[in-house]
Amino acid sequence: MKKKLSLTSKIFIAMGVGLAVGVLVRSLPEGSLKDTIIIGGVFKVLGQGFISAIKMLVVPLVFASITCGVASLSNIKSLGRIGARTLIFYLSTTAIAISISIGLAYLINPGVGLDMSSLVSEQPTIAQSSSFADVLIDMIPTNPIKAMAEGNMLQVISFSIIFGLTISILGEKVKLVKNFMENLNEIFLKMVNLVMYFAPFGVFGLIATTFATTGVEAFASLLKYMAVVLLGLLIHASVVYTGILKIFTNLSIMPFVKKFPKVGAITFSTASSGAALPVTMKTMNELGVDSKVSSFTIPLGATINMDGTAIMQGAATIFIAQLYGVDLGLGGILTVIFTATLASIGTAAVPGVGLVMLSMVLNSVGLPVEGIGLIMGVDRILDMCRTTVNTIGDCICTLIVAKKEGVLDESMYYSENDMIREELEIN
């Protein structure tokens, strides 16, 4: 039986074909065939149609997913300090992660030297410079419906968090509402899957348009973008996490490094934190963490800890801003940090959702969503790397919380025994 190509394989093929066709079309003489029928017709319909479908899902998916994510955290009230410490760690490290990627993006400037402003019908709206206080005030919606209609993502996120928190507090009284939101979220996630089915066609149209109008110069910029993301992931995993673990627990990172590869192999190959949950929790228990901590922090981290994803969003936003010649300013950068950090609460582990969340961040600062088309082809490779970093963050948080709660067996942590390997050998 002939094996079907995966969506990832189809996207890679579409990117390669789009690149080749785009370069070929660029060599054609100027005229209506090239500009109107091919670039402005076929390529535009495929590329812009896909982008419009992604835009369609941004607000409803963000509202439903974040509401469900917050509403599901009802057990934080009973867990008290564990819940508070876990949330503070996850949100703080996400903010640090995106700040690192933004700094690296401005240092390396992956999008400088390539002008893509001619590829959009409307010029991007340059984010107005705002103070820190203005950004905080702008997060509060005076009219949630208007915020959704206008695509004001910071306000949509804020309302979603408050709405989800209220559902969590009321508990059983509003169980029907919670079930309705969960069903609604499932519908929107399924819609994402349906839209992603057409991703290869969209990627072909977007990549072909890019290379037909800018040439192979775009490829060099894409490599620099990948370098920013990978360097950001490396710094966050090796410096930030190691430093935080040492500062708050005085533990050596080496026992964790020795026992994490079994988890990393799963997250890297599947690009899913959820797929590695059982092995991750077993590994934490093997490292001496009490199950009452790991059974809470690991599943919660798989839901709201998206440091690797935040690094991608920060780098991609600056990359796309540079491509279109937009200076975000301090207000725009703060908006990106706030939006990506808060959005991490509702980012689901479903292929394609990361792109929807990225389009939300781009919308929050007035950048063209069309820029996503250039990075889609390499996103799968980066996704495997950033998912692994996400899981490392879950584990480091678990170790810190367990140490602070006094439920970390340090003799087990520094032990060379590998319970999982022994268990597998017995079975």
Region spans (language model):
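Signature of multi-pass transmembrane helix bundles
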Residues: 2-4, 8-12, 19-27, 31, ...
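Residue-level signature of catalytic and energy-coupling elements of molecular machines
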Residues: 6, 50, 79, 148, ...
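Alpha-helical transmembrane segments of polytopic integral membrane proteins
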Residues: 18, 59-67, 76, 101, ...
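Membrane-water interface of transmembrane alpha-helices in multipass transporters/channels
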Residues: 34-42, 80, 216-224, 251-261, ...
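Juxtamembrane helix-boundary/capping and inter-helix hinge elements in multi-pass membrane proteins
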Residues: 71-78, 113, 171-175, 183-186, ...
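Membrane-interface alpha-helices at helix entry/exit sites of multi-pass transporters
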Residues: 77-85, 190-197, 286-302, 330-331, ...
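Transmembrane alpha-helical segments and their short flanking loops
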Residues: 113, 314-427
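Alpha-helical membrane segments and immediately flanking helix-loop junctions
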Residues: 257-313, 338-355, 378-401
